[in-house]
């Protein structure tokens, strides 16, 4: 849908501009659609990459946070089915609703030597509690998840109810309402929560310990301080329980 694609570009560029970020250009990502199945081909999205730069010198972590805010603001006005795979100064995400062995064929970029990366995270899984969709392909922006979050409905509701409890001098969490996706996959919602905590300045390991804690009864006899850490943060963040692997 060319109209929806143009509306998505305009919306994202506007919010980037509001965050002090200049749009340098857009690129249509080359794809080999013949490797797609019938269902994937019927839902095939327009896949483009945006290139941006800060309008003035800015610290690396501040730039990443500005990109996050611009994306979250823009998402509120996106047409249906528009989705940002990644908007980062660290990583580039490639998603596809294809068999894993067909990823390099679907994205010729992945075979280009000039696009080689020092680190690559690859993940595949089949949908269990949600219907397959392009935007639900793994990995997400900060995590790859295999399994099910058995407490997902409660986690989503508590993120709405307790969202006001999260405070940071770096970000206004009220801008992010709803804090997590209420309709996507469980992995997607967990990824939303993780990136919000990171944008607020929390350390990655600290954030993961808060979201996916062990049973505190196991810790109390070993490390009372660590048990107190989990109990404190548990007041405003229920465990995302049930993941097989993250």
Go through each PLM region and give its residues:
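Conserved short alpha-helical segments that host acidic/polar catalytic motifs at enzyme active sites
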Residues: 1-246
């Amino acid at each position: 849908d060319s109209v929806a694609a143009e509306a998505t570009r305009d919306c994202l560029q506007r919010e980037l501009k509001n965050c002090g970020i200049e749009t340098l250009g857009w690129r249509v990502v080359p794809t080999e659609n013949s490797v797609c199945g019938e269902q994937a081909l019927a839902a095939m999205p327009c896949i483009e990459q945006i290139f941006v730069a800060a309008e003035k010198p800015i610290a690396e972590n501040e730039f990443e946070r500005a990109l996050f805010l611009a994306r979250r603001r823009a998402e509120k006005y996106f047409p249906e089915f528009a989705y940002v795979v990644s908007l980062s100064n660290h990583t580039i995400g490639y998603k596809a609703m294809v068999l894993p062995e067909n990823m390099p064929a679907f994205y010729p970029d992945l075979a280009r030597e000039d696009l080689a990366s020092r680190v690559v995270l690859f993940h595949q899984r089949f949908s269990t509690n949600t219907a397959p969709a392009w935007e639900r392909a793994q990995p997400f922006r900060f995590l790859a998840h295999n399994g099910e979050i058995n407490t997902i409905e409660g986690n989503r509701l508590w993120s709405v109810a307790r969202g006001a409890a999260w405070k940071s001098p770096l970000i206004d969490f009220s801008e992010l309402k709803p804090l997590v996706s209420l309709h996507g996959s469980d992995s997607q919602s967990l990824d939303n929560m993780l990136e919000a905590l990171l944008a607020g300045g929390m350390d990655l390991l600290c954030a993961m310990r808060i979201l996916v804690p062990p049973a505190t009864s196991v810790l109390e006899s070993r490390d009372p301080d660590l048990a107190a850490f989990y109990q404190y943060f548990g007041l405003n963040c229920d465990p995302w329980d049930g993941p097989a692997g993250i």
